[in-house]
């Protein structure tokens, strides 16, 4: 569960984007819709602990996201819309980064690749984001 309590934040001190907002997001799949520039990405960054609210707090499963604790980070991963992808293979990338996720299962990883018809030897930079 994601819980946002009384968050205020803005890029300029005299112009808040969010002013004392609160909401709870339960388990499930959600979409975040809004006009260009209204703060969708900023909200996601606040939830992930990549930005720090002026006031209030964001919690994911009762862990304050700003603290970026290992018990929180080992269960969640934020994949930005645009990012530089490494030129190593999918298998190499998984081998290098799976050590940061104690619950990573090589077996599940292999099953997911198979279900999605993705070749693990393929360079990560060539895989579709879709």
Segments the model singles out, each with a brief description of its role:
Residues 8-13, 25, 60, 101:
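Conserved A-loop
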Residues 34-39:
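Walker A (P-loop) phosphate-binding loop of ABC-type ATPase nucleotide-binding domains
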